[in-house]
């Protein structure tokens, strides 16, 4: 009986800690993400569970994250809901990119969140933002080519090295 109780306790604590790793994307979250990476390049990917091309892009970014461990900072923002967090975690894990920081839309008015990110964004995914050192961004909608990401990484790595 004690073994069963311990097993259940471990199962539920693991599940809840996984969900806690997904941050609520609310008004002000975009600024929080940007300020935490001041002076650092990063990639911000908006995706959702129903997206046809998102698995391909997230798997590609996972492979690149292994190759460029120290140089590639990827943040994932799911445009689903907080209720979907367990499924989002499972899906991201299956793509191999579970080490990335994860957020999920947590407002009943998703248009407001999208507007805060980009006034010209109407919710299409995948939508990938490439932020350089000065946080000037390049926005790509649809599947991003691996060569584009590698070229972007090389350009930004050169700038990081010049700065130091």
Where are these regions (language model features)?
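Sec-dependent N-terminal signal peptides
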Residues: 3-12
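Short active-site neighborhood of thiol/selenol oxidoreductases, capturing the structured segment around
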Residues: 36-52
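Loop/turn elements at helix/coil->beta-strand transitions in domains of secreted/extracellular proteins
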Residues: 37-42, 70-73, 98-100
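Solvent-exposed loop/turn segments at secondary-structure junctions
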Residues: 48-52, 79-83, 108-110, 135-136
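Structural microenvironment flanking redox-active thiols in thiol-disulfide oxidoreductases
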Residues: 56-96, 110-113
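Short, internal strand/loop/helix patches
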Residues: 92-125
């Amino acid at each position: 009986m004690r073994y069963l109780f311990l097993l259940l306790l471990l199962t539920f604590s693991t599940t809840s800690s996984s969900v806690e790793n997904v941050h609520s994307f609310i008004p002000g979250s975009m600024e929080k993400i940007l300020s935490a990476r001041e002076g650092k390049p990063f990639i911000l990917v908006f995706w959702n569970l129903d997206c046809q091309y998102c698995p391909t892009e997230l798997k590609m970014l996972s492979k690149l994250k292994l190759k460029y461990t120290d140089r590639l900072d990827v943040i994932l923002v799911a445009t689903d809901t907080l209720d979907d967090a367990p499924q989002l975690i499972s899906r991201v894990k299956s793509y191999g990119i579970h080490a990335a920081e994860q957020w999920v839309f947590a407002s009943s008015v998703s248009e407001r969140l999208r507007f805060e990110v980009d006034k010209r964004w109407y919710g299409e995914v995948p939508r990938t933002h490439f932020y350089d050192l000065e946080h000037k961004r390049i926005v790509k909608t649809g599947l991003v080519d691996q060569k584009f990401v590698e070229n972007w990484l090389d350009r930004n790595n050169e700038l990081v090295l010049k700065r130091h």
